[in-house]
Regions:
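Metal-cofactor-binding active-site regions of metalloenzymes
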Residues: 2-260, 303, 319-424
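Histidine-centered active-site/metal-ligand motif
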Residues: 35-37, 267, 309
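Acidic, glycine-rich loop-and-beta core segments that form the ion-binding/anion-interacting portion
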Residues: 234-294
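Active-site-proximal binding-pocket segments
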Residues: 271, 275-282, 286-333
């Protein structure tokens, strides 16, 4: 695309030029993906990539059982390759891959010039097996139009924690995040794990337990240098309440975030394991009581909260709370919401209520190559949405320039996050 000169950037755009100007910005400087489940190369086999991982992603596993007679217990007894073959046959050969998740696989194959038809997976497997991870990451990020991602790092994961303790090499393209799900949602299961690591804690948070949890968080903050702490929470989450989780949040997590100068990310609305037979694919969604968020934002005005809610029915309420509390930053269209029709609706509502003071999207990618189609979908879906916003503004009498669009796009897809977490 041609370079825009400074003179052109300040000229008012005609309505017919606005969409092209937005698309130009969307394909300009790379964006920052502020929540993923990807891993830097030094964390080794934790990082998932390649065609078999793409096809056996739990979104597609959930779809498999709607289009196949294969039972979950039969499926989970198969090898990785056999699982991928079963999903390919059911969702890509015997059915047109029209869902968001299946189209994503097609988009990745197309991006690498691989066959997208109903043939087998041999050529794709051969291609991915030949890749070297460092150069492959560079190519994937280039295709996705991103420069860096934010990881999800669990200090109590028995596979991940030792890698950090052994000095996993940092990578400027991968920002760490201290994930707290095990501590906050499965405290009784983790007490003995923490005790074995030398922390004096008990199930009821007696004695030095709170101080010891803060010591644990401080050690991992120093080790990881995370850009925020994060937790996913159920649709039943309440605050305040008489529970171990509420005490840990109020007395350990919130003060630690404040001490370290980083936000807490709250992802609210999961209904865990509604169908345990599906394993990772077995979680559902529920409408949450966001008065818990209200009380946290009001009770801890010196803390910052990144917030994403899983239920579509909670989105308007989250926007209202963000208008009332500047320490709340709504982000992304998470999980079941990451479908183009819902992304468009949510983004339009957020712009109407919050201007440009939110983060429209993150990929939530669990497999490396997913960032290609997830960010492609985001650009394709949101360019018309943002362009229409500017057309309405121009129609109301305010000229819109390329400079305006450049500023806003950079704010939405990089600047708001960098400012909120202190990277800028």
């Amino acid at each position: 695309m041609p370079t825009v000169t400074p003179d052109q950037s300040t000229v008012a755009l005609a309505p017919g030029e606005i969409l092209q100007a937005v698309e130009h910005e969307f394909h300009g400087a790379p964006w920052l993906d502020m929540h993923t489940h990807l891993f830097m190369p030094s964390l080794g086999k934790l990082g998932l990539w390649g065609i078999d991982e793409l096809i056996t992603y739990h979104y597609l596993e959930a779809e498999l059982f709607r289009s196949s007679n294969l039972r979950p217990d039969q499926y989970f007894g198969l090898s990785k390759r056999a699982k991928a073959d079963a999903i390919w046959k059911a969702l890509f050969v015997e059915n047109a891959p029209v869902s968001e998740a299946t189209r994503g696989v097609i988009a990745v194959l197309q991006a690498f010039g691989l066959p997208t038809g109903t043939g087998g997976l041999a050529e794709a497997r051969k291609f991915f097996e030949a890749q070297k991870i460092a150069s492959h990451i560079h190519k994937v990020f280039e295709l996705a139009g991103i420069s860096e991602v934010v990881m999800t790092n669990d200090p109590l994961d028995p596979e991940e924690a030792p890698l950090w303790e052994d000095g996993a090499a940092p990578d400027k393209k991968f920002h760490p995040v201290l994930r707290l799900d095990r501590i906050l949602n499965k405290w009784t299961d983790q007490v003995d794990v923490l005790a074995a690591k030398g922390f004096s804690v008990d199930r009821n948070l007696g004695g030095k337990s709170i101080a010891e949890v803060r010591r644990f968080l401080a050690e991992w903050f120093a080790r990881m240098k995370p850009v925020y702490m994060a937790v996913s929470l159920p649709d039943t989450f309440q605050y305040p309440e008489e529970s171990v989780r509420a005490r840990l949040i109020a007395e350990a997590v919130i003060p630690s975030c404040r001490e370290f100068g980083i936000p807490a990310s709250l992802m609210i609305g999961v209904r865990y394991q509604v169908n345990p037979a599906l394993k990772l694919a077995g979680d559902g969604v529920g409408k949450a009581d966001l008065r818990a968020l209200e009380r946290l934002a009001a009770g801890f005005p010196d803390n910052r909260f990144l917030v994403s809610v899983l239920s579509r029915e909670n989105q308007h309420e989250l926007c209202v709370y963000a208008r009332k509390f500047a320490n709340i930053l709504p982000f992304g269209c998470w999980w079941f919401l990451n479908n183009p029709s819902v992304v468009e609706e949510m983004t339009r509502e957020r712009i109407e209520m919050l201007g440009m003071s939110f983060i429209p999207q993150h990929s939530d990618a669990r497999v490396l190559e997913q960032v290609i189609y997830k960010w492609r979908n985001t650009r394709r879906t949101l360019a018309p949405t943002l362009a229409n916003t500017y057309k309405l503004l121009a129609g109301d009498g305010r000229p819109v320039t390329r400079e305006d669009i450049h500023r806003d796009v950079q704010r939405l897809f990089r600047g708001n996050f960098e400012r909120f977490v202190g990277l800028s």
